[in-house]
Amino acid sequence: QQPNSPVVVGVCEVENRGVLEDLVKTPLMLPHDYGVIHFDSPDKRGIDVGLLYKKKNFTPTSFSKHTLYIYNGKETKDVKIKVGDEADGAENNVNIDVKTKRIYTRDQLLVSGLLDGEEVHFIVNHWPSRSGGEKKSSPNREKAADLNKKIIDSLYAINPEAKIITMGDLNDGPYNKSVTRNLGAVGKREDVSTKGLFNPMYQMHREGMGTIAYRDAWDIFDQIIVSEPLARKTNDYSSLRYWKAGIYNPTFLQQNAGQWKGYPLRNSNGVPGYSDHFPVYVYLLKEQK
């Protein structure tokens, strides 16, 4: 409903590609001519990740999915599956294969392309849930962060000035170990080191903001984290630079009455809603020539 709709949209908990194809054909979205990138993931429930993009602004040059292998908290390995390869597995992230002890969860989607002529990399995430408790399940998200860091480091190895945006539902806050230590994202732009990551959601959390509420406590599981070349403080805007971030929580996305007033408006008791999470966004700036 905005006059300038998002150029790139990362989505989580998508049942299948058909859902996204239907979405971009709805009356409000059809005029914007969005493209769709999606892989089926091993998650049995069909809650995949995907990417929507405005074709006039972003041209994908490559995309792949990176499978997270978790074995009851044991080691993981990264398998990149290119376009056309089959997805593997068929269990959800709280079930364990009795033979292999593997916990099935979502893949991480890497999309590289030209954003208004400039190379940018997007990684869409939906890290393992907190099923079984935050502490007990934390190693699974730490492994997801390790995989994410491996992808990012590989992009930095090719180009130390790589412009990378990693985003999604991390099922952890900006302060959790998975984000701060395993992934290495910091909350102050001036503290971002070379080949580092800046997390604008850290300060939002400190200010009491949130994308998800549980037992009257807000947290920010939904995060957009940018690489140092994007976050670098400079007066040079001849190329894309991070400007600002926010949580999109207009009143129509909120419960408007009752015990959960102000919470995200989710499907409940047969009443349709939008989501139990508020979406987040970032703006990038670039001088027009």
Q: What does each model-found stretch correspond to?
A:
Residues G18-D22, R45-D48, S131-E134, G173-S178, ...:
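Extracytoplasmic/secreted cell-surface and envelope-processing proteins
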Residues V14, W127, D169-L170:
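Active-site metal-binding loops of divalent metal-dependent hydrolases
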Residues E118-N140:
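Active-site His/acidic residue clusters
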Residues G18-D22, I47, N140-K143, L147-S154, ...:
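Extracytoplasmic/secreted proteins, especially bacterial periplasmic and envelope-associated proteins
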Residues Q1-N4, N16-M29, N57, K150-P160, ...:
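Sec-exported extracytoplasmic/periplasmic mature domains
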Residues I103, E142, D153-I164, D172-K289:
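Metal-dependent phosphoester-hydrolase catalytic domains
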Residues N4-V8, P31-Y34, D116-V120, N159-K163:
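Loop/turn elements at helix/coil->beta-strand transitions in domains of secreted/extracellular proteins
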